[in-house]
């Protein structure tokens, strides 16, 4: 991490003008994020779960939501509201991604409610429908399937009912192994 910080600092000192994007699981220590202050223009964290039961089961991190809440607060403190250039390109801000998982739309609604009630229009919320069950999902029959359109739409409509207007949604069939990073 220190090598990346040093390289970014040097690049910015030498006139780097493109935005620096920090892609994250959301499970970050605030102390680490503070080292990046002034170097990162756009934070792109996940916010995977609100439920400690789900985060313990699927990510072995029962404290995921508490860690992610603290990390997100630091990210937003550093970047402020999302700012775009004249062509609509994001220049600074935080875009929080949430992957809606099959069978857990209530947890997704809890995530969206937390994000919107806490940050309103300071952040953009990206609701993703691309959950793809990989071979290990066979160990968890409840998530060993793709997300239905009904489940995803229910979360999207819930976000809209809260007043979320700044964000991104996915249309169509995006759950293919060919698009998994």
Model-predicted segments: where are they?
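Charged, amphipathic alpha-helical interaction segments
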Residues: 73-76, 160, 164, 172
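A local structural micro-motif
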Residues: 19, 167-168
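Radical SAM enzyme core and accessory elements
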Residues: 171-181
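Conserved beta-strand termini and adjacent loop/short-helix elements that scaffold enzyme active sites
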Residues: 128, 169-172
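Conserved N-terminal glycine/acidic-rich loop preference
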Residues: 85-88, 94, 134-166
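Conserved AdoMet/S-adenosylmethionine-binding subsite of the radical SAM
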Residues: 1-140
